[in-house]
């Protein structure tokens, strides 16, 4: 009998599929070797650890296509193929490989399809009694309008089977929807679009978990998204443990996650995304991915549990409690003893025409993390690592959409209390003054000079809070402000949730300073810090 296992890598780096999956691939290889098998990798990205000469027992530097993988399987005769660790690229090969008689290790290909296929997944959730946002599928523009009206605006629309939320958008009315169909998506029976109810003000969160054949489930923790629902999970900062998700909602998330893993007979890894609606006090399931996700490295490092390695051993027949015991690890209790923040890294300075506003279409090209004992300090460290050094003083410009004006008041008040001078565009300034917050009015780009962009160019602005607004002039103004911020390296924030987090971080660092700790010490529970003044830290670290 063969003693080889073939692992399919993630292929080239691109938005939505990056080096996080290579981390998972390498950990899978190490687990395979520890279990006494030879690990073979197929990947075609030279900028990865998985394609280093000494990572696997054999490397095939070939395209990640069905034909190439079948040729390798025919030559090597492995006991099976692992498709869970190369992101959506490798998962998409699961069913085609199984149909051609190849043994796919882990979750059965039919169960993979049950989680990937919208209709089958909806039926599974219905059977399990788990709610999901109302949704529908449209094969032509008129059907899309009907479905959206039945669900009720706003809705989230996207083509089926996408990586990184490409061509995904939140639409607020029929005119918006028709424009989306015309510009972004060709709708046909072969290429339907998916339409979901968008939960405004919802708190998104997700879990990465592993399950073995005996039914043991391991969930290291819940990652709460800092951005509001509607920002792609790959672009949103997230935090472990959750900071605003109620305790009972966290319990529901864990319960639903275990039910889905069991209901779909998952063997190996699974990622499930949820949204909590505070108004209805209801947790909804958005989607489940039967594979390693881009957050596996983050949650693994945040709680000190190598999830990809444990998931691989579960796929190879080991039981999770036994593996944890072997590694000297305790099952997580939901409190890692630290606060860890993951922040997305963007390359907007290299993309002159792209609006650096966050939305449902992924734009991040990497990620970093900050660790501390408080959320504010961890968030500040994550921003610093991502190249955004939050200012502790200076001038802040605020220009927000009408829907965000009630929420900006406490943020502006806190900035003023922290010693910032405030500038605001006319509408925002009027709202702030009504609530007793003094600020100067600054012109929008469309209102002539000197305007916000002129001040950014002259180095007079230290922080920008600018949420996207509707209307042609408003969109053009916002775009010009955000592009100027990128060009002149001024920290800019495009969501209310991120603004709240940033102000909390500024307040904490300004009042208490920040500490630097060794990662190894943190996982041993040793918090003997070196006190560091904020000014001693540079944009590139401490």
From Swiss-Prot:
GO molecular function, one term: metal ion binding
Binding-site residues, Mn(2+) 1: 273, 287
Binding site for Mg(2+) 1: 273, 287
Positions bound to ATP: 158, 197, 199, 204, 230-233, 273, 287
Cofactor descriptive note: Binds 2 Mg(2+) or Mn(2+) ions per subunit.
Pathway terms, separated by semicolons: Amino-acid biosynthesis; L-arginine biosynthesis; carbamoyl phosphate from bicarbonate: step 1/1; Pyrimidine metabolism; UMP biosynthesis via de novo pathway; (S)-dihydroorotate from bicarbonate: step 1/3
UniProt keyword annotations, A-Z: Amino-acid biosynthesis, Arginine biosynthesis, ATP-binding, Ligase, Magnesium, Manganese, Metal-binding, Nucleotide-binding, Pyrimidine biosynthesis, Repeat
ATP-grasp domain segment(s): 122-316
Pfam families: CPSase_L_D2 (PF02786), MGS (PF02142)
Entry binding sites for Mg(2+) 2: 287, 289
This protein's domain notes: Corresponds to the C-terminal section.
NCBIfam families assigned: PRK05294.1
Family: Belongs to the CarB family.
Protein name: Carbamoyl phosphate synthase large chain, C-terminal section
